[in-house]
Every structure is written in structure tokens, then in C-alpha cells.
């Protein structure tokens, strides 16, 4: 026998060609947004000696990532409808104000967003139907 065989990762990292060293909280949770940064902000803004659990930071990060993806998808659709390839603040405005739930959630004014196209029904010309006698 040539000696002892040890298991585990050891100093060189994971076996079988896997990722080396440690993994970030975001990678473990399968998220793109930074869990560590969100946790740091939560801890910094917590009142007094309030403790912040790691699952709270992961959950908040997942919610922020979902809302961002939702807004970007709707803004991308608005840009595609206007046949442009770049999302502008106008597209964000159209996307947010066009969705009732996002409109109630995001009440902020978007710079360079413009206004929604709307004409009051009282201002439209009334077209009378001609009846055949």
C-alpha cells in the first residue's frame, strides 16, 4: 500500500473539477443580486441591536431580483413595440404605469419618463349613427 487516503476537499479545493474554494451566498441561493451586500445594508439600517438573519437577506434579495426582472421584461416589451433596441426611461414609465400592481407599488416619478398617452372621453368627437328609414 502506498499510504493513507484522505477524503474531503483539502487545500486544493473541490474534487472532480468542481468550483474551487468558497461559494458566495448569491451562488448558493441561485441568485444574481448580491446577498451579502443586501445583508450589510439591512444590518446598517436596522434599529438599535436588531439582529438580521441570513434567510431574511436571501428572501429580500430574491424579491428585489424578481421585481427587477418583471419591470425589465415589461420595459423590454414596450421597447420592442416601438421597434427600438435600447430601454429608455420612457419605456420604464410605460411599463410601470401600464401594469396596475406595479403602478400601485412604484409611486415614484421617473425622470425623463414623460406622461401616458390619454385623451378624456368627453373631449372626443361623438360620431352619430345614421339610421335607415
Curated annotation (Swiss-Prot):
N6-acetyllysine modification sites? 4, 9, 11, 15
The family database entries (Gene3D superfamilies) matched by this protein are listed as:
Histone, subunit A
Q: Where in the cell is it found?
A: Nucleus; Chromosome
Q: Where is this region: Disordered?
A: 1-31
Q: List the disulfide bonds.
A: none
Task: Name positions with the PTM N-acetylserine.
Answer: 2
Q: Can you tell me which family this protein belongs to?
A: Belongs to the histone H2A family.
Please give the name of this protein.
Histone H2A.Z
Q: Which organism is it from?
A: Eremothecium gossypii (strain ATCC 10895 / CBS 109.51 / FGSC 9923 / NRRL Y-1056) (Yeast)
Q: What is the lineage of its organism?
A: Eukaryota, Fungi, Dikarya, Ascomycota, Saccharomycotina
